[in-house]
């Protein structure tokens, strides 16, 4: 009996570490995909979301925070720094007005950014630590969970009001309109769980199971988003990387919630 409990605990710790790896490496992929995206725009004489001098500082801060988080050095402080850096850069890109996106694409982009910020706040609370030396900050974790709930509300909203997202589900998932409504209800219930703070572990476990097929069939269908919906290739790859980071957050909360 004790050996079964020990092996189960070991497996949960291994899965939790996997979630931490996916989340802490997310900024590296974000910076790489942004560099590739802005290189493509430069060839077409188009501007990046953030002016170039500030862009280098922004990416430098992201890589710095990601590096320290990855090595586990002052992870809580640098996770908080990563959340702050991402919030500032997103706000700067939004008010800059250098690039104009469709409303449906803004919802997809900014909702994922909110979820990643929430993931960093969860990490800053002490969740996902293999050997926790300090007590966990419940306020930071609750705030991060609220951000995840906001993301899920945005996803549910897109399923009802964005024809681009609806077609992505209709074309690549069986069940048609019934499947869309089931996903809408499921996203709504999960959002309520994260926003209220009740059944968070169960909600995170369901989300961790739900996200991989959605990432593979919906976000991973680059041909649909790039060729049909004219989403820039590296922008879609950035969104896909953020979905992986959100999955990492769900795994952390599912195993250490």
From Swiss-Prot:
One of its GO terms (biological process) is positive regulation of canonical NF-kappaB signal transduction. It is a multi-pass membrane protein. The keyword Metal-binding does not apply. GO terms for cellular component: membrane. Keywords: Membrane, Transmembrane, Transmembrane helix. It is found in: Membrane. This is Transmembrane protein 101. It comes from Homo sapiens. The lineage of its organism: Eukaryota, Metazoa, Chordata, Craniata, Vertebrata.
